[in-house]
């Protein structure tokens, strides 16, 4: 890994971050339990805090962005639906086809310029419209990412 000046934050990916000593101490000293049984007070506090910050009824902690994308896709789609996403989106390029395996969805890819989607091109990918009957899948989810890994 290339060295960066200490005053810069490396936002390329969460996979290049390293916890500082304070973070390691917090992890070592965290009160933990079985999250499935509701016995992990640290996770419970985190979920409650984030839900409160966002004005939501509840929160859900998942251990990775890939897993959170899988949950989001499954929540907002039905099998046979189509997801519209930028051609180099993380969801399409780096997640091993999880959207298809877990949700039964296909993907319509939108070309971009350095990760920036042209709204006209986006609209072209939403093929199901009045009068199309059942010839095209229902585009039930548009995935917009910021930042783009490849743009």
Ranges and model annotations:
Residues 2-4, 51-54, 76, 100-102, ...:
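Solvent-exposed alpha-helices and their adjacent loops that cap or buttress functional pockets
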Residues 9, 58-61, 81-83, 106-108, ...:
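Structural motif
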């Amino acid at each position: 890994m290339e060295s960066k000046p200490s005053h810069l934050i490396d936002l390329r990916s969460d996979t290049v971050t390293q916890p500082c000593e304070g973070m390691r101490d917090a992890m070592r000293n965290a009160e933990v339990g079985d999250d499935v049984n509701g016995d992990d007070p640290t996770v419970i506090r985190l979920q409650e805090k984030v839900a409160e910050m966002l004005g939501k009824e509840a929160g859900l902690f998942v251990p990775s962005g890939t897993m959170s994308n899988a949950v989001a896709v499954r929540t907002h789609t039905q099998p046979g639906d189509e997801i519209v996403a930028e051609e180099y989106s993380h969801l399409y390029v780096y997640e091993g086809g999880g959207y298809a395996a877990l949700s039964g969805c296909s993907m319509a890819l939108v070309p971009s310029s350095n990760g920036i989607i042209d709204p006209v091109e986006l609209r072209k990918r939403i093929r199901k419209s009045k009068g199309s009957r059942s010839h095209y899948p229902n585009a039930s989810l548009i995935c917009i990412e910021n930042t783009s890994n490849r743009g």
